[in-house]
Amino acid sequence: MRLFVSVDLPDGLADAVAAVQDRFADADGLRYTDPGQAHVTLQFLGDVPESRADDLGDALESAVRATDVAPFDASFEGLGVFPSLEYISVVWLGVGDGSEELAALHDAVERQFVAEEGFEPEDHDFTPHVTLARMEHAGGKQLVQNVVEREHPEVGTARVEAVRLTESTLTDDGPVYETVRTVRL
């Protein structure tokens, strides 16, 4: 099973996320994420045996309990790309308020899963974000660059009360997500 740890955006922000995606409508080469599945990935675990799901849920519980992060509000605003404006592979919506709490959760999860569960540490700094689209070819690169450099959408604020261990099943119609474990803050 393919797993990741995330914080989900509420359904109430899906329309606002879709409206931000619409700003890139004329850009060729983008494959959009489903706004109804918007989330901030704290740690991508990859393919793991199904037999480990319960243990990984317990590890997530331990990681969250090791922090002093209580429920908090996160604002979703601004745009960015990975890895750079010159070589765009991902277009994302940023996090304003709440980014420190998300970083603390990420750090705790990464420590737990690397030290105790044998996963590899990520090879890049954590930037809390919601993936809006992936660039499959550079046809729309200039438009994406222009929008990212000139616009600063403010999507809204959401109360973050839980972290989820989520299974991602890849299909021809896009990924299907199923919650394996929810850990309340």
Place the predicted regions along the sequence by residue.
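Histidine-dependent nucleotide/RNA phosphoesterase domain, centered on the 2H-phosphoesterase fold
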Residues: 1-185
